[in-house]
């Protein structure tokens, strides 16, 4: 687990969600619902929100932007085996009118979705190259957790970056350009996310496991 960071209101820490193809959606649902539960069933409603937004704006979400035709993407994202990423986070940020900040433990950077919209609140996720988890603020006695923070609270953001830096120094990340995957449908061995995406486009296979 990543380093915990103390804050005036408690301790910022990482909560682990299931390592499945929907960890992004589970993590977003978790932080938007005040850390009340890890609800792995919530991912389908979030996937539908994204599909609807994409279908309603085919000019922005064209084939060049999505990497596949708009209609195909809308079918693809509703499949529970499909991973989410930057496109999906940007749509969810806009839909819920909240800044979604993602700490990347491989690069050490922070990606701030919705930053230019000047939303009043933010939520925090951490990403290791493959898996997303939520960051939460636990009270000192562990009785309460907070997952939504004012965007004016730079201290929370700084501590989230510290957690990411600690994870990076401990090499708690997956190098997606070089890790080995197996297609769980045809058993083909693939190196890196690029080969996996090319294989999926060519074959329609979308179920991969890390070796």
Place the predicted regions along the sequence by residue:
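Papain-like cysteine protease catalytic cores
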Residues: 2-10, 15-114
